[in-house]
């Protein structure tokens, strides 16, 4: 990489001192540990219906839902799939499963039937909680004992019941479960640094540690309090929102306003109505905020913090947002699902804030270690030298579900998780991301694994070979594009290929451009040489962007 690696490891730690982490507690006990301080304060607010539950009501309802899930046969170590938008029912189901020592695997409700079936089967889900409009996509699923819907449906199959039946269960039926800190509580799916989606095993200890790294201590890195109102517009099936919004909010005793989906005008109405103070966003939402003229018609002065994550945010976009929200502290965090997910957080969000640089994604979280290595040699690099970012700490995943080989490729023998991201740490301990080793495409913060799309493409009889890479896009970040080798005599068109894929995948995985090519460039090992394809793409498309 143009730098001389050092055999002596340079390890970076937070500027803030390490803290005590009550990692003996199950996640649900940890989140409600300070319940007595804010039991009567609002906890969950449905941004669509305005229904509000206090902290005491959420704890009680979670116990009832847990008892209801137990009555349906959910046991310790079992998996429930939450195929839901942001909703009170999502939160109650997640906590209810945790109380039973069960795991929640979260899935995007916009997934196609095939995508849902793959994840449910791989995770070994026993029960699915969803909306009635998605029940038709669940037909033929093996191993599912019951489907629970959160809305009133006119007609549902026999094995479908309403969520209200869970809520009406006597909480006394909830069994006492001995939950071990190393037990898995969350099972999100991620493509990791490469390849197909895999179940990421996040334990009670791991998530307790991750939340504590952010919001606990005398000078928390992420200063939330019971006086704060958090806007939960990012989907809870994504680990960023589940961890840094929901779990951190619960731990701090803040009110959490749940938005089922992103609509810019409704978002501003909720900010004004509930005096939202904390706004966790992703760059595409920031783009809407700065471009939409309606923003100026609403009072958004209550926002004191804008957190951005899931994808990098450019300096120009940052500056435009500062003009719209002059009262807000703006900063970025950095993470990946396998890391628990938060690796670093902007110290401008601390109770006693630090000055931070534009473009930085913060400093490494407390009670963790970070190093930068030369990807070729594995040797540690010092400050201001770009290399692969590695993280170590109790917050990282236990491993990939039923995939020890992929786990070994991601977490080394010394416990370092290799992110596949290229970055450097400057003289002030701030982390900057400069490139990606991993092949994932980031569409508005969502992961798109090229290998998943390639596997679909090459099953088509008119395609001999295929490769998928990304192209930059101003509003979406990155878009998937395909390079295709036609089968002999085939005249398959770009439009036919796009339609073939769009029928099988969720909207953000759709192919946006198709380029026909004589052969896919590959190394002797058979690995696709994506750099060559990106170079060709740069020649085809001015500025490397969508035409």
Swiss-Prot record:
It is an enzyme of class 6 (ligase). It comes from Narcissus pseudonarcissus (Daffodil). Its EC number is 6.2.1.12. Keywords: ATP-binding, Ligase, Nucleotide-binding, Phenylpropanoid metabolism. Gene3D superfamilies: 3.30.300.30, N-terminal domain of ligase-like. Residues 263-332 are annotated as: SBD1. Mostly expressed in stems, and, to a lower extent, in bulbs. Pfam families: AMP-binding (PF00501), AMP-binding_C (PF13193). This is 4-coumarate-CoA ligase 1. InterPro entries: AMP-bd_C, AMP-bd_C_sf, AMP-binding_CS, AMP-dep_synth/lig_dom, ANL_N_sf. Residues 333-400 are annotated as: SBD2. The gene is 4CL1. Produces CoA thioesters of a variety of hydroxy- and methoxy-substituted cinnamic acids, which are used to synthesize several phenylpropanoid-derived compounds, including anthocyanins, flavonoids, isoflavonoids, coumarins, lignin, suberin and wall-bound phenolics. Belongs to the ATP-dependent AMP-binding enzyme family. Both substrate-binding domains (SBD1 and SBD2) are involved in the substrate recognition, and are sufficient to confer the substrate specificity. ATP binds at residues 190-194, 238, 310-312, 332-333, 337, 421, 436, 527. It catalyses: (E)-4-coumarate + ATP + CoA = (E)-4-coumaroyl-CoA + AMP + diphosphate. One of its GO terms (molecular function) is 4-coumarate-CoA ligase activity.
């Amino acid at each position: 990489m143009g730098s001389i690696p050092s055999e002596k490891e340079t390890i970076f730690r937070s500027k803030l001192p390490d803290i005590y982490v009550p990692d003996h507690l199950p996640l649900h006990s940890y989140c409600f540990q300070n319940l007595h301080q804010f039991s009567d304060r609002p906890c969950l607010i449905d941004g669509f219906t305005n229904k509000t539950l206090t902290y005491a009501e959420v704890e009680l309802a979670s116990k009832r839902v847990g008892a209801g899930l137990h009555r349906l046969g959910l046991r310790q170590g079992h998996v429930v799939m939450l195929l839901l938008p942001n909703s009170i029912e999502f939160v109650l189901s997640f906590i209810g499963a945790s109380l039973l020592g069960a795991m929640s695997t979260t899935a995007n409700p916009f997934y196609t039937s095939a995508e849902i079936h793959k994840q449910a089967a791989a995770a070994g889900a026993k029960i699915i909680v969803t909306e009635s409009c998605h029940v038709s996509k669940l037909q033929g699923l093996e191993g599912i004992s019951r489907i629970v819907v959160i809305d009133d449906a006119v007609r549902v199959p026999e094995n479908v019941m309403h969520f209200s039946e869970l809520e009406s269960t006597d909480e006394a039926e909830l069994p006492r479960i001995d939950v071990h800190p190393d037990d898995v509580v969350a099972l999100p799916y991620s493509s990791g640094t490469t390849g197909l989606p895999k179940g990421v095993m996040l334990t009670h200890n791991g998530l307790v540690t991750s939340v504590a790294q952010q919001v606990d201590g005398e000078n928390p890195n992420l200063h939330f309090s019971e006086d704060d109102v958090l806007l939960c517009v990012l989907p809870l099936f994504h680990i960023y929102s589940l961890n840094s919004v929901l779990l951190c909010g619960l731990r701090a005793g803040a009110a959490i306003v749940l938005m089922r989906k992103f609509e810019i005008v409704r978002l501003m109405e909720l900010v004004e109505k509930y005096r939202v103070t904390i706004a966790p966003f992703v760059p595409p939402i920031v783009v809407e905020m700065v471009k939409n003229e309606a923003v100026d018609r609403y009072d958004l002065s209550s926002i004191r913090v804008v957190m951005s994550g899931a994808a990098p945010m450019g300096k120009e976009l940052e500056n435009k947002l500062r003009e719209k929200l002059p009262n807000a502290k703006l900063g970025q965090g950095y993470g990946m699902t396998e890391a628990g997910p938060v690796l670093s957080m902007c110290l401008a969000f601390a109770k006693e804030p630090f000055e931070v640089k534009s473009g930085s994604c913060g400093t490494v979280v407390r009670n963790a270690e970070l190093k930068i290595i030369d990807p070729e040699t594995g040797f540690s690099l010092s400050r201001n030298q770009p290399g692969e970012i590695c993280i170590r700490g109790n917050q990282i995943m236990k491993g990939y579900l039923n995939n020890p080989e992929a786990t070994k490729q991601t977490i080394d023998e010394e416990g370092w998780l290799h992110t596949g991201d290229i970055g450097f740490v400057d003289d002030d301990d701030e982390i900057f991301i400069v490139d990606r080793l991993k092949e994932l495409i980031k569409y508005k913060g969502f992961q798109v694994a090229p290998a998943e799309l390639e596997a679909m493409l090459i099953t088509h009889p008119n395609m001999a070979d295929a490769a998928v890479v990304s192209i930059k896009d101003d509003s979406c970040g990155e878009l998937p594009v395909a390079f295709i080798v036609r089968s002999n005599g085939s005249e398959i068109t770009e439009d036919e290929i796009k339609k073939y894929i769009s029928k099988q995948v969720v909207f953000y995985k759709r192919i946006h451009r198709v380029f026909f090519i004589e052969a896919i460039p590959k190394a002797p090992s058979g690995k696709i040489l994506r750099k060559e394809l990106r170079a060709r793409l740069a020649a085809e498309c001015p500025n490397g962007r969508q035409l």
